[in-house]
Amino acid sequence: MAAEIRTFTCLNDNFGYLIHDVETKATASIDAPEAGPILKALEREGWQLTDILITHHHGDHVGGVAELKQKYNCRVVAPHDKAAKIANVDLRVANGDVVKVGSLLARVLETPGHTLDHISYVFDTEKTLFAADTLFSIGCGRVFEGDYPMMWDSLLKLRALPDDFKLYCGHEYTASNVKFALTVDPDNVALQARAAEVTKLRAENKPTIPSLLGDEKRANVFLRADEPSVAARLHMKGADAAAVFGELRERKNKS
């Protein structure tokens, strides 16, 4: 089995993703921020859309679903929780479910916090994680519907995946994430290296994803809230990791 992944920009800073099964020619869009760029990418590759795998109900992730469904009659897969907020759903999934895209297998991880219905899709064979707005490169999503312990627990689920997995996230926020992270984790050598890489990529107008999950574990301060050095930097020595994470997220909200 082999998969091809295409990345492109949707809306202002959303990422659009297509994952294509070479064997069966099945193609899934991970979320559908808007139809236009997805249609162009499909046309450019000569692919037919068979599935849309939705991560959560926010409009900037489902805005193109209706038009794509009408054109391709593709299957729409969405979280079971609050599924009524998402139109045209064919299959509702929960934690541990496996979704087939041709011969490719996507494992569902419930990762609530950003929204209560948020899920991530893990393609274990392809060592690929689509984390949408739960985990960003050098950052994480805002916590709109859940709470900080819930979001921290979701990040721990993603952190538990192997280091060689590729992270594909929902938005191109990496440069601003790096800027914030350096204010709270300035001596982190891995973060410094990632900052230099991101500066170069953005100067060349290239996306900063995918990133390797192992690199994120070393450089992303939001994945390191349980490390004593991070708590000490925030003057929270001995504090619960979820509380440290919450303080990091509050500071990022204000940055």
Regions found by a protein language model. Give the residues of each.
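Conserved beta-strand hairpin/beta-sheet module of binuclear metal-dependent hydrolase folds
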Residues: A2-W47, S120-A132
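Core dinuclear metal-dependent hydrolase active-site scaffold
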Residues: T7, L18, V98-D124, T128-L129, ...
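Divalent metal-coordination and catalytic microenvironments
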Residues: I19, D31, H56, L68, ...
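Active-site HxH/HxHxD metal-binding segment of metal-dependent hydrolases
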Residues: T27, E34-E110, K127, A193-E197
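A short acidic, helix-capping loop that chelates divalent metal ions and anchors anionic groups
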Residues: A84-A87, I138-F144, N177
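Active-site-adjacent loop/tail segments of enzyme domains
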Residues: G139-F165
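Accessory terminal helices/loops
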Residues: L156-K166, A175-S255
